[in-house]
Amino acid sequence: MIRNFLLFFMPIYAILFLSGCTANLSDPEIDFEPPAYVEEMPSKEDNKDFTSVGSVFGQGENPLFSDHKAMHVNDIVTVIISENTQSSNSGSKQISESDSLNLGGGAFTSAGTNSAVNSAVSKLNGIANLGFGSTSDSAYKGQGSATKDASFTTTVSARIVKVLQNGNYFISGKREILVDNQKQIIQIGGVIRPYDIDQGNRINSSQMSEAKILYKTQGDVERATDRGWGTKIIQSVWPF
């Protein structure tokens, strides 16, 4: 009974174990469906512009002279991501310790006050010539250093999600690129000031507060370099 049970489940366990040691083999895809906020927004109705008599500025949504920077919710602003990271740190530690212990006095002692007994004990200790001594030395020295230099430059279009009470904008944007079965995902979010947006409706990522920038790839390269979930579990509990 037990043998039949093992023969039945052993292949299943082997398949599960081997599948855990490999990454997900599904190919990456891009969802071309419109975002949820686009579906929820009603279609815009055409509004005619009216011109005031004797005025060159005009009225309506497209006046002749106006600032075309992003100002409202769902307006688009271009974020120029230019991040450089440089770090260098080093450390060293050295510890040394030395102990020495010597015990003399011989192997025999006398608690009495008789001079003859004390003399005899002293002679015995001289003949035996016993004593105790120990020496211990330990030393530790460690040194390490790390240097990192990375740069990332690109542009992402983001939309204004919320206009805060103080006039600042919370923006969020995402870009996905699929080339030769390699998917690149760039996502950004943060708070910006409307005064930092230039006339070309652009803003630098260094002018963002609470900036969060995500860049990752999906595809064959990721599958080749990523560890399977079975390997991760084994390494998490492996004590050595």
Curated annotation (Swiss-Prot):
Location of this chain's protein in the cell: Cell outer membrane; Bacterial flagellum basal body
Tell me if Isomerase is a UniProt keyword of this record: no
Q: Is ATP-binding there in the keyword field?
A: no
Its topology with respect to the membrane? Lipid-anchor
Q: Where does it primarily localize?
A: membrane
Q: What residues show lipidation of type N-palmitoyl cysteine?
A: 21
Single GO cellular component term: bacterial-type flagellum basal body, distal rod, L ring
Which GO molecular function, any one, fits this protein according to its record? Answer: cytoskeletal motor activity
Q: Which GO BP terms apply?
A: bacterial-type flagellum-dependent cell motility
Q: Which Pfam families match?
A: FlgH
InterPro entries cross-referenced by the UniProt entry = Flag_Lring (IPR000527)
Q: Which top-rank group of organisms is this from?
A: Bacteria
Please report which positions carry a covalently bound lipid of kind S-diacylglycerol cysteine. Answer: 21
Instruction: Alphabetically list the UniProt keywords.
Output: Bacterial flagellum, Cell outer membrane, Lipoprotein, Membrane, Palmitate, Signal
The secretion signal range is: 1-20
Per the entry, what this protein does is: Assembles around the rod to form the L-ring and probably protects the motor/basal body from shearing forces during rotation.
| UniProt family annotation | Belongs to the FlgH family.
Q: HAMAP family per the record?
A: FlgH
The record describes its quaternary structure and partners as: The basal body constitutes a major portion of the flagellar organelle and consists of four rings (L,P,S, and M) mounted on a central rod.
Instruction: Provide the protein name.
Output: Flagellar L-ring protein
Q: What is the lineage of its organism?
A: Bacteria, Pseudomonadati, Campylobacterota, Epsilonproteobacteria, Campylobacterales
- Gene responsible for this protein: flgH
